[in-house]
Amino acid sequence: MQCSRVLGIEGTAWSLSAAIVGWDKVYAEASHPYVPETGGIHPMAAAQHHASHVSQIVRQVLDSGYDFDGVAFSRGPGLGPCLRTVATAARALALAYDVPLMGVNHCVAHIEVGRWQTGCHDPVVLYVSGANSQVIAFRRGRYRVFGETLDIGIGNALDKFGRHLGLQHPGGPKIEALAREGKNYIHLPYVVKGMDLSYSGMMSAAKEAAAKYLKEDVCFSLQENAFAMLVEVTERALAHTGKNEVLIGGGVGANMRLQSMLDTMCRDRGAKFYAPPRKFFGDNGSMIAYTGLLQLKYDQTIPVEDSAVNPIYRTDEVEIPWL
């Protein structure tokens, strides 16, 4: 169908964000992230935060004055209480404005906003966020997962190690800063099994190392190890698929060291590396709205009564008719 703009709401975990997006640009956006006082994300507390602030951020984008042809929301994967909160808001908006409703896969949204912002066409995607570490590529109508973590996602691993060091959430950016000051590599477990990888053993070893070595050196070693594993499986996916583009997405993708390692690998293989602008790495309403725009164009809408959230929604469950 013909459509020009969609309002999207993101709220899978700590980020709460809304945006109105068209084919050409982001027309309006607002956010109000949940920041825990201590520790990591508490699902019920995050959901309470989202419930308290979702009307505020939606009102901010509505006050921009731009109309929209549909409403999209993050259907999953994510924290159930948070997903249900934003889904309720999206249903209410769709009914109030009498427009179609689209339930968006959060992982697919990271891919699509990256493709939109960089202009790449058919890349191997390294998707690295809190709970996810996946190597993905399009094949036979879907984004197929070629490899992934067998235990903990890279973002959660970094955040947990950050808390072990006494760093405030989120730990990833603070570990990146400390790693730039590190000079000595400390041996840590390196676990790649075919196309899959594992971080739990490496994290345990890093915690033990933190009691013996400078935290800057441990952060440096942790990053080098963890990112080398990701680059290895991404390079293997490039060889297997024969593609010549690599796109990075997800919050951890903003790490400049990881981007540098991927860019070097791509140059060595004659491939091109793509990274979207920094604002699109973290969870954001714009990626939900843009993917909702694609789904609306291809009639992937859902009735309100069938719009239940899915906390374990897999990337490869989604049909992709636009590629």
Curated annotation (Swiss-Prot):
One of the GO biological process terms: tRNA threonylcarbamoyladenosine modification
Description of how the protein assembles with itself and partners: Monomer. Component of the KEOPS complex that consists of Kae1, Bud32, Cgi121 and Pcc1; the whole complex dimerizes.
Keywords: Acyltransferase, Cytoplasm, Iron, Metal-binding, Transferase, tRNA processing
Originating organism: Methanocella arvoryzae (strain DSM 22066 / NBRC 105507 / MRE50)
The protein's Enzyme Commission number: 2.3.1.234
Cofactor note: Binds 1 Fe(2+) ion per subunit.
Residues where substrate binds: Y127, V128, S129, G130, A131, D159, G172, E176, N255
First-listed, main subcellular location of the protein, grouped into a coarse class: cytoplasm
Gene3D superfamilies in UniProt: 3.30.420.40
SUPFAM superfamilies: Actin-like ATPase domain (SSF53067)
PANTHER family: TRNA N6-ADENOSINE THREONYLCARBAMOYLTRANSFERASE
Co-factor(s): Fe(2+)
Keyword Oxidoreductase: no
Function noted in UniProt: Required for the formation of a threonylcarbamoyl group on adenosine at position 37 (t(6)A37) in tRNAs that read codons beginning with adenine. Is a component of the KEOPS complex that is probably involved in the transfer of the threonylcarbamoyl moiety of threonylcarbamoyl-AMP (TC-AMP) to the N6 group of A37. Kae1 likely plays a direct catalytic role in this reaction, but requires other protein(s) of the complex to fulfill this activity.
Family: Belongs to the KAE1 / TsaD family.
Gene Ontology cellular component list: cytoplasm; EKC/KEOPS complex
Full protein name: tRNA N6-adenosine threonylcarbamoyltransferase
GO molecular function term, any single one: iron ion binding
